Regions:
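Generic transmembrane alpha-helix motif of multi-pass integral membrane proteins
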Residues: 37, 82-91, 105, 197-203, ...
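Structural signature of hydrophobic alpha-helical transmembrane segments
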Residues: 43-56, 93-102, 179, 183-192, ...
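C-terminal ends of transmembrane helices
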Residues: 59-71, 107-118, 196-206, 246-255
Length: 317
């Protein structure tokens, strides 16, 4: 019999019609409405930041794989997705060199040093954002004026809605229509709720994701908002709830495979998000930290709802 070299890659080992490239391509397509909205709201500086983050992420992955003499994986588009998601988590006008540092952390340290796609312990983009938030807090919390591209909706400048809530300036909150169309302060991908919802529908229709995690996450945010005395609509439409719930909590590598595991995963993320938002600490937003914490305990959640193989556990007495 002919000897063959077999390479066992990271699980799950599931055969299906969709390749990594097609899945990542669908994610990029789903993000396009948010990209367009970010340019309409913040101008060409948003597009520049997005292009640089995508290019830097692809370059870092290519160089790392080449230096370590591994098969290059830039064609699977996962590096492009990471770069674009990181850009979506940055404010317009964020220094380019700092964004490139964030791409290095996301691609090289979080993704490639742990073995590449499917082996990372946490979502690379969200970890890169947290690193930048800690290292460059001032730049990560500087918000430019949001331009109005919809007649009848005024432009909004200054703090984000969550920062206003933290300061007790509830009367200064943008109207719901501002939140829906993204005409308010925030990161590039956090502002326009309608664009993110369009992306969500596309991913569900294409069967790239199931609605379980986003729906349970948003529902948990709503319930926790009522318990803690906040307006649920405002809590859902502000910050990174929709961006994180749709595009980052659903990451294949760092989310549970079982249906009940997904429910607990999203439930935990929603509770942690609202507890951080309600705390008296310096961070008005809790989505990033909630996702990272749930990513870390994800392997344990895969045991919830998992079916036992036939013959395991012994006979009933």
């Amino acid at each position: 019999m002919t000897d063959r070299k077999l390479l066992v890659s990271a699980g799950p080992h599931v055969r299906g019609g969709a390749s990594t490239t097609s899945v990542m391509g669908d994610v990029l397509i789903a993000l396009l409405p948010a990209v367009v909205a970010s340019v309409l709201v913040f101008g060409t500086s948003a597009l520049l930041l997005e292009v640089v983050c995508v290019a830097a992420s692809i370059l870092f992955e290519y160089l790392f794989r080449r230096i370590t003499k591994r098969t290059n994986t830039i064609s699977d588009l996962s590096a492009a997705v990471t770069g674009l998601l990181l850009a979506m988590n940055l404010p317009a006008g964020f220094p380019i060199w700092m964004a490139i540092v964030g791409c290095f952390v996301a691609i090289v340290i979080v993704k490639q040093l742990f073995g590449g796609i499917g082996c990372n312990f946490a979502n690379p983009a969200i970890t890169g954002r947290i690193f930048l938030l800690i290292a460059f807090a001032g730049q990560m919390t500087t918000w430019p004026t949001a331009n109005s591209y919809i007649p009848g909706i005024d432009a909004v400048s200054g703090a984000t809605p969550l920062a206003l809530i933290k300061e007790g300036a509830v009367d200064s909150l943008p109207a719901v229509k501002n939140l829906l169309f993204g005409i308010r302060g925030g990161c590039l991908g956090e502002t326009c709720a309608i664009a993110l919802i369009i992306g969500f529908v596309y991913l569900v229709v294409r069967r790239v994701i199931t609605p379980t995690i986003p729906v349970v996450y948003v529902a948990t945010i709503a319930v926790m908002s009522l318990i803690l005395g906040y307006d649920p609509i405002t809590m859902i439409l502000t910050g990174g709830v929709l961006l994180g719930g749709i595009f980052m909590l659903t990451d294949y590598s760092t989310s549970p495979a079982t249906e009940w595991g997904k429910v607990v995963f999203a439930l935990g993320a929603g509770i942690i998000t609202m507890l951080i938002r309600n705390s008296s600490g310096g961070y008005p937003e809790g989505v990033s930290f909630a996702i990272l914490l749930m990513n870390i305990i994800c392997p344990h959640l895969n045991k919830i709802g998992a079916k036992k193989p036939f013959g395991v556990g012994g006979a009933e007495k």
